[in-house]
């Protein structure tokens, strides 16, 4: 089994409780937003592979100053774990920064920690990363922070919050299963002939996934 978690937002105590309930799960995955409000990461009791959300400590990610139990999955890179091919496209979509090379995304220092966080454009994904993902083949799991289109929040009554580049990757790469977060709502849909699941906040539910069939069970807390 593979365990899958939605946005954590520093709630590592709950993550450890979930892991303790499932000692049979060798590793876990997460769709981003791990850090707490101070940008801190805590060790957990099983390997937790994760992509970036828009609320992270991007300096810690860049310097690999992370607990060993939290291996980071960079955008547009395939990671193989126990035979499972995993890749991700973390962060959010910003049209004004989409064509910027990832290495050139600015991260200026501001007068406060919050202002510095908001000014850090490393929270976004860019086109060069999307293109790398579109060229991937034989993916088992594809993780994103953003949702594909159409995705309507608040039970379908809100505006379309999905992002077209996610659909482009799903259409090109055709992973066996797609997981996303960011909206803290459970959803189950098919996009571009790919099963696409929106994960709830980790405080409410998580998934157990059969790596052979990609069938899943949503477990509520």
Language-model segments: residues:
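Core catalytic region of metal-dependent phosphoesterases/phosphodiesterases
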Residues: 3-81, 172
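Short hydrophobic/charged patches on amphipathic alpha-helices used for structural packing
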Residues: 16-19, 131, 167
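Conserved beta-sheet core of the metallophosphoesterase superfamily
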Residues: 42-57, 68, 87, 149-219
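Active-site-proximal beta-strand elements of phosphoester/diester hydrolases
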Residues: 1-9, 83-92, 141-145, 195-200
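Active-site-proximal loop/helix segment associated with metal-binding centers of metalloenzymes
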Residues: 84-156
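Catalytic cores of nucleotide-sugar-dependent glycosyltransferases that transfer UDP/GDP/TDP-activated
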Residues: 8, 32-34, 110-125, 159, ...
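Structural motif
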Residues: 80-82, 191-192
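Conserved acidic residues
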Residues: 26-28, 140, 176
């Amino acid at each position: 089994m593979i365990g899958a978690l939605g946005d954590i937002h520093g709630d590592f105590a709950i993550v450890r409780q979930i892991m303790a309930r499932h000692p049979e799960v060798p590793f876990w995955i997460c769709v981003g937003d791990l850090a707490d409000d101070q940008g801190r990461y805590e060790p957990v009791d099983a390997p937790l592979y994760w992509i970036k959300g828009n609320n992270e400590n991007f300096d810690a990610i860049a310097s690999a100053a992370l607990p060993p139990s939290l291996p980071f999955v960079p955008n547009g890179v395939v990671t193989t774990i126990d035979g499972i091919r995993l890749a991700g496209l973390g962060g959010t979509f910003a049209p004004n920064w989409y064509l910027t090379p990832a290495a050139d995304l600015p991260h200026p220092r501001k007068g406060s920690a919050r202002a510095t966080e908001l000014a850090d454009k490393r929270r976004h994904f860019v086109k060069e990363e999307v293109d790398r993902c579109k060229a991937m083949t034989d993916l088992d799991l594809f993780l994103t922070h953003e949702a594909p289109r159409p995705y309507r929040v608040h039970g379908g009554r809100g505006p379309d919050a999905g992002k077209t580049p996610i659909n482009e990757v799903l259409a090109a790469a055709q992973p066996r299963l797609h997981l996303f977060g960011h909206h803290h709502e459970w959803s189950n849909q098919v996009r571009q002939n790919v099963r696409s699941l929106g994960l709830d906040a980790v405080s409410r539910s998580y998934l157990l996934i059969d790596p052979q069939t990609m069938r899943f069970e949503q477990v509520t807390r």
